[in-house]
Amino acid sequence: MAIVVGADLKGTRLKDVVKNFLVEEGFEVIDVTKDGQDFVDVTLAVASEVNKDEQNLGIVIDAYGAGPFMVATKIKGMVAAEVSDERSAYMTRGHNNARMITVGAEIVGDELAKNIAKAFVNGKYDGGRHQVRVDMLNKMC
C-alpha cells in the first residue's frame, strides 16, 4: 500500500508536514506534486496513482479541500471525502471505503492534519451493510 499525496500552491507546506509524518510512521509515500499545478491537475494525478493499486490511498491538500473533493467525485470508481477532523477521516474508510481524502490547509493546522492522515490510513473498510452504499456510489460515475 502506498499513500499518494499531492497539493497545489496553497497546500504544499501542509502536504510536506503530512508527507514527512507518514514517512516517519513507516508508510510508503508517493508525492505527485508539481510546481504551479492547479488543484484539478493535482487531484487527477493523485487519483491516477491511487487507481494503480486498489490498496493505495490518496490525500490532496489545497486551501479549503472543497475543490479537490469536487474533482475526485467525478472520477469513475473513486470514493472521496472532504475532512477536517480525525473521526470523519477514520469513518469514511470504515463505512464508505473512501480511497481519497481532501483537506484544507487554511482549515486545519499541522497536528490536526497529521492526526487526520493517521486516522485515514489506519482505517479499514468494514464491508457488510456498508457495501450497498458503496455500490450505489460506484454506479454514479
From Swiss-Prot:
Keyword Nucleotide-binding tagged: no
Please verify whether the record's keywords include Cytoplasm: no
Q: What phylogenetic lineage does the species belong to?
A: Bacteria, Bacillati, Bacillota, Bacilli, Lactobacillales
Its pathway? Carbohydrate metabolism; D-galactose 6-phosphate degradation; D-tagatose 6-phosphate from D-galactose 6-phosphate: step 1/1
Instruction: Report further notes.
Output: This gene was sequenced from pMG820, a laboratory-derived deletion of the naturally occurring plasmid pLP712.
UniProt cross-references to Pfam families, sorted A to Z: LacAB_rpiB
Q: What is the similarity comment for this entry?
A: Belongs to the LacAB/RpiB family.
Species for this entry: Lactococcus lactis subsp. lactis
Q: Which UniProt keywords apply?
A: Isomerase, Lactose metabolism, Plasmid
The molecular function terms in GO held by this entry are: galactose-6-phosphate isomerase activity; ribose-5-phosphate isomerase activity
The encoding gene: lacA
EC number(s): the record gives: 5.3.1.26
Q: Which InterPro entries match?
A: LacA, RpiB_LacA_LacB, RpiB_LacA_LacB_sf
Name the source's superkingdom.
Answer: Bacteria
Which signals induce this protein? By lactose or galactose. The operon consists of lacABCDFEGX.
Q: How does it assemble?
A: Heteromultimeric protein consisting of LacA and LacB.
Q: Which reaction does it catalyse?
A: aldehydo-D-galactose 6-phosphate = keto-D-tagatose 6-phosphate
What NCBIfam families does the annotation carry?
A: lacA, PRK08621.1, PRK12613.1, rpiB_lacA_lacB
Q: Biological process GO terms, please?
A: D-allose catabolic process; galactose catabolic process; lactose catabolic process via tagatose-6-phosphate; pentose-phosphate shunt, non-oxidative branch
State what protein this is by name: Galactose-6-phosphate isomerase subunit LacA
